[in-house]
Amino acid sequence: MGLTEIMLVLVSLAFVATAAAHDCQNGTRPASEEKREGCDYYCWNTETKSWDKFFFGNGERCFYNNGDEGLCQNGECHLTTDSGVPNDTDAKIEETEEELEA
């Protein structure tokens, strides 16, 4: 195999790897990740032979398998449904109610 053929094979492999990695970019939800809970996902990097971590874009819908739903913000899923777990707002309301009763 001559140098030209080797270069052609290498360029072709690079193109295929780039096309495959196109689905794995920050901010884009690959079709393979439609059922992924939370706001992060991993894609196999054939060059480094390791997993690369990516994040869904801000405003992207996110969910958890228990039914909670939210929106991604800076790589975290901020819930828009009541999860039944107290949050900072609940604590402030409770403090205000106690102050009013006193």
UniProtKB/Swiss-Prot annotation:
Residues 83-102 are annotated as: Disordered. It comes from the Eukaryota. GO terms for cellular component: extracellular region. It is found in: Secreted. Its main location: secreted. Glycans are attached at residues 26, 87. Keywords: Glycoprotein, Secreted, Signal. Pfam families: TSGP1 (PF07771). Salivary gland (at protein level). Saliva (at protein level). Midgut. The keyword Signal applies. Induction: Up-regulated in salivary glands and midgut following blood feeding. Residues 1-21 form the signal peptide. Disruption phenotype: RNAi-mediated knockdown results in impaired feeding of adult ticks, observed as decline in the engorgement weights. No significant effects on the ability of nymphs to feed. Salivary protein that facilitates blood feeding of adult ticks on vertebrate species. Inhibits the lectin pathway of complement system activation in the host. Does not show anticoagulant activity in in vitro assays. Belongs to the salp14 family. This is Salivary protein Salp9. It comes from Ixodes scapularis.
